[in-house]
Amino acid sequence: MHVRSLRAAAPHSFVALWAPLFLLRSALADFSLDNEVHSSFIHRRLRSQERREMQREILSILGLPHRPRPHLQGKHNSAPMFMLDLYNAMAVEESGPDGQGFSYPYKAVFSTQGPPLASLQDSHFLTDADMVMSFVNLVEHDKEFFHPRYHHREFRFDLSKIPEGEAVTAAEFRIYKDYIRERFDNETFQITVYQVLQEHSGRESDLFLLDSRTIWASEEGWLVFDITATSNHWVVNPRHNLGLQLSVETLDGQSINPKLAGLIGRHGPQNKQPFMVAFFKATEVHLRSIRSTGGKQRSQNRSKTPKNQEALRMASVAENSSSDQRQACKKHELYVSFRDLGWQDWIIAPEGYAAYYCEGECAFPLNSYMNATNHAIVQTLVHFINPDTVPKPCCAPTQLNAISVLYFDDSSNVILKKYRNMVVRACGCH
C-alpha cells in the first residue's frame, strides 16, 4: 500500500471536523481551484466545554482512546529527530505534485539540524507502512561481564504499546559510531547484534544472531541493523522480549569495549542516542474493525454533544450573513490548530493543518468548474422542473488528501501516522 493511502482512518473524517467548524478559524470568502485565497476569519476563544468536545472528536478521528501524556522527553533526542526526517519526507509528498496542497505552513514545531538521519531505504519502507514508531532504550545499567575478556552492551525496547492489528513490515536498531583517532586507527571491526533468547544466573545468556557489519575504525555515522524478524516475534510473544545484545570484535577475534570502538551509548549526546524504529501496516481484519466501529463511536460522541447542531446552525448563519446571494459550490478555508487545543506538549508536528470545507449552491445550470457528477446534473434538472419533489444536489468534497501526524505516546515513544481523507482538495456537486 502506498504511504499516501492509509485506510485506517474513516472515509468521512472531515464530517466530524465540519460540525464544530465555527469554533475554529473559518473563512467566508471564495476559494478558487487555483489556490488564490482571499479570506477573512472568525476568531474567538474556545470555552472549556467546547474545547473538550473538540478534543474528543479529533482524538476519535486520530484513533486515540485518550490524550497522551508523555513523560518529560527531549524533542531533540535522536529518535524524535529521525522521525521528524520521515515526517518531512511525507509532508512533501502530501503537498501534491504541484506543491500546492496546503495554503498554510505544513511544518513542525522544530526542525532537524545537519544531514538527514533517515536513509533512502527508510523512505522505501514508508511506501508500505501506515504507521512508524520509534522506541527508546530502557536499559539503564549494564550487567557485569561473566567473562573478563568478553565485552558487550544490552538494549531493551518496550513494544507492548503497539496498537492491536498492526503488523511489522520492517524494523531497525540504530546506533551511532563516532570517529576514533587513537589506538584502533587502522583496525577493522566486526559489530554483531544478537537477540537474547534466555538469561541465566552465573553464565552468559543464550543468543541468536540477527545481523552484523564490518566497518573501519575511522568510520563515523549511524549504523543500522535489521531486526524485523525478532520484532515480529516480540509483538506476537511479548514475554520473549529480552532485548538485544551488541558485541564488537577485531578481525582476529579480540573483544573490544563498544565505547572504545566509538559506539555511543546512553551517556552520549542526546542526538546520538541508540534507538529502535519499526514500520507497521494494519491488517485487513483490523481495517474492517476500524471501519465498523469508527462511525458508531463518532455517532455516539455527537449524540452526547447537542451543541454540535448549534454549531452547524451558527456556521450557516455566519456564512449566509457574509453575502446577500449564496455562492456556487466552492472550497472554503478551515484551519485546525492543535496548538489552540493545548496539544503542543505531545503533538510534535504539525502545529495545525488546513482542512478546508465545501459550501455553496448546486443550482441549475451546473457549470463545468462545479465538478458535478452525471447523477447530480440529472437531479438538478429534475429539481428545476419540480423543486418540491427532488432536492438540489449537495456540495461535497470530490478529492481528499491525507495528513501525517507526529506525536509522543504515554511511554514517550514517537509515533508517525498517516490519516487519509483529512484535507479537502476539491469540491463538487453530488
Swiss-Prot record:
GO molecular function: BMP receptor binding; cytokine activity; growth factor activity; heparin binding; protein serine/threonine kinase activator activity
Signal peptide start-end: 1-29
Residue pairs linked by disulfide bridges in the UniProt entry: C329-C395, C358-C427, C362-C429
Region of interest (Disordered), ranges: 290-310
Organism of provenance: Mus musculus (Mouse)
Gene from which the chain derives: Bmp7
Phylogenetic lineage: Eukaryota, Metazoa, Chordata, Craniata, Vertebrata
Disruption phenotype: nullDeltion mutant mice die shortly after birth and display developmental defects in kidney, eye, skull, ribcage, and hind limbs. They also show defects in the development of the axial skeleton from the skull to the tail and the ossification of bones.
Propeptide positions: 30-291
Gene3D superfamilies: 2.60.120.970, Cystine-knot cytokines
Descriptive protein name: Bone morphogenetic protein 7
